[in-house]
């Protein structure tokens, strides 16, 4: 779009987003955000102060508008230029190849699982003792429940005694 054909009044009515869309369409290549801002300022005749006042809203509008895409490294382009599959490839950062480390001998022999064969016959008496110990623990926990029941009964008895005391106290006050 040739902006020279528009009068200054018509250019002032154009939004920054419309100008960027036209600029990118004419260039046909991705451009950095700073270059886009400079071109907008030049086309619309904005001072540096005006640009600074509008730059935050412009960046927000650029992100929200679906016609534009951020290609990383602060480069912007038109979404219509990139098929969906290519967008993913451009946006994703390229992984850096990792340096290979020298394998050092740690002083231990490598353990191979295939050498060991475990059967049910390998079960030791220690495992049977563990089961018996677990049974004892469970029995002890049942005993703890009995202690809680005793506490509940004690609380009930205390509450009844307190009620009886309150009644006798009130009778004495009435006299």
From Swiss-Prot:
HTH HARE-type domain boundaries: 14-81
Any single GO BP term: DNA-templated transcription
Purpose of the protein: Participates in both the initiation and recycling phases of transcription. In the presence of the delta subunit, RNAP displays an increased specificity of transcription, a decreased affinity for nucleic acids, and an increased efficiency of RNA synthesis because of enhanced recycling.
One Pfam family named in its UniProt record: HARE-HTH
GO MF annotation, one: DNA-directed RNA polymerase activity
Gene name for this UniProt entry: rpoE
Species in which this protein is naturally found: Bacillus anthracis
Domain of life where this protein originates: Bacteria
Recorded family membership: Belongs to the RpoE family.
Listed InterPro entries: Asxl_HARE-HTH, RNAP_delta_N_dom_sf, RpoE
Protein name in the entry: Probable DNA-directed RNA polymerase subunit delta
């Amino acid at each position: 779009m040739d902006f020279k054909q528009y009068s200054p009044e018509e250019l002032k009515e154009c939004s920054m987003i419309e100008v960027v869309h036209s600029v990118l369409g004419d260039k046909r290549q991705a451009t950095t955000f700073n270059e886009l801002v400079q071109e907008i300022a030049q086309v619309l005749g904005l001072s540096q102060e005006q640009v600074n006042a509008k730059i935050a809203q412009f960046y927000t509008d650029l992100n929200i508008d679906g016609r534009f895409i951020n290609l990383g490294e602060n480069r912007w382009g038109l979404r219509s230029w990139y098929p969906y599959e290519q967008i993913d490839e451009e946006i994703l950062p390229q992984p850096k190849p990792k340096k290979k480390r020298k394998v050092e001998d740690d002083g231990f022999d490598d353990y191979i699982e295939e050498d060991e064969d475990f059967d049910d016959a390998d079960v030791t008496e220690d495992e049977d003792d563990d089961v018996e110990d677990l049974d004892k623990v469970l029995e002890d926990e049942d005993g703890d429940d009995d202690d809680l029941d005793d506490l509940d009964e004690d609380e009930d008895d205390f509450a009844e005694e307190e009620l009886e005391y309150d009644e006798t106290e009130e009778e004495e006050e009435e006299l």
